[in-house]
UniProtKB/Swiss-Prot annotation:
Residues 33-39, 105-133, 197-217 are extracellular. Aquaporins contain two tandem repeats each containing three membrane-spanning domains and a pore-forming loop with the signature motif Asn-Pro-Ala (NPA). Residues 1-11, 61-83, 155-175, 239-242 are cytoplasmic. GO terms for molecular function: water channel activity. A motif (NPG) lies at residues 201-203. It is a multi-pass membrane protein. Pfam families: MIP. Keywords: Cell membrane, Membrane, Repeat, Transmembrane, Transmembrane helix, Transport. This is Aquaporin. It is found in: Cell membrane. The chain crosses the membrane at residues 12-32, 40-60, 84-104, 134-154, 176-196, 218-238. A motif (NPA) lies at residues 69-71. GO terms for cellular component: plasma membrane.
């Protein structure tokens, strides 16, 4: 194995591990709150998403893209910010990571396989939530997340001559990206506790759906998250001239 191939394998493994840890953290928080009928479920999940994402981005950003979200990675591919083949590899690694995360929850919690999958599956909170409600909730949350991820991390530096502030030295905000993105993930998790549940990550939806065989609203989640993420990326890259 040559050095280049080894480096790519390390990047993909790191992204898989990163996604697995994030998925396990989120699924565990969901299981702990749903199984106990906790009245502070949205707070618990929101804080878990926030803190885990901050630590994981800081930890893995030197090894991989540390997206642990196919919506972000696909948006980076479509805007030319990430090599196509490597990006596809990252997406596959993320999906494998989330599948492993779902299996880890099964062996760590005493609810049995099917019940565990039922608890962690992404689903509309009640029958009162329409398909339109579900779609636009996930669309908007994904839009916000990907836009901010591009603004502070993926595409944080304007190209020379394109900035609106000609002659003014640009500030590199990428060093604050893990903190900013983590806080964003945290507050977004609070916004959909009565509608879609707040997934805004196709990987989070993918794991339990594939392993549990429950594809109710699966397509709606995936399409809304990917399209919302793409819009956020396109606006940041092309309309803001960055």
């Amino acid at each position: 194995m040559n050095t280049s191939t080894k480096l790519i394998c390390q990047k993909l493994f790191a992204e898989m591990l990163c996604s697995c840890i994030f998925g396990f953290a989120v699924y565990s928080a969901i299981l702990n709150t749903k199984a106990s009928n906790s009245s502070i479920s949205s707070t618990t999940v929101g804080l878990t998403v926030c803190f885990s994402s901050i630590s994981l981005i800081y930890t893995f950003c030197d090894h991989s893209v540390a997206h642990f979200n196919p919506a972000i990675t696909i948006a980076a591919i479509c805007t030319g910010k990430l090599d196509i083949l490597l990006g596809i590899g990252y997406v596959i690694a993320q999906l494998i990571g989330f599948i492993l995360a779902t299996l880890l929850t099964v062996v760590c919690f005493p609810y049995g396989y099917l019940k565990t999958m039922e608890f962690i599956a992404s689903a509309r909170i009640s029958d009162d939530i329409s398909t339109v409600n579900l779609f636009f909730t996930e669309f908007i949350l994904s839009f916000i997340l990907v836009f901010i991820a591009f603004e502070v991390g993926i595409n944080a530096i304007r190209e020379p001559g394109v900035t609106l502030f000609v002659g003014i030295k640009q500030i590199d905000r990428s060093k604050f990206a893990p903190l900013t993105i983590g806080i964003t993930l945290g507050f977004l998790a609070f916004l959909a506790s009565t509608t879609s549940g707040g997934a805004f990550n196709p990987g989070i939806v993918w794991g339990p759906a594939i392993m549990g065989g429950n594809f109710d609203d699966f397509v709606i989640y995936i399409i809304s998250e990917l399209s919302g993420g793409l819009l956020g990326a396109f606006i940041q890259v092309f309309l803001l001239f960055k």
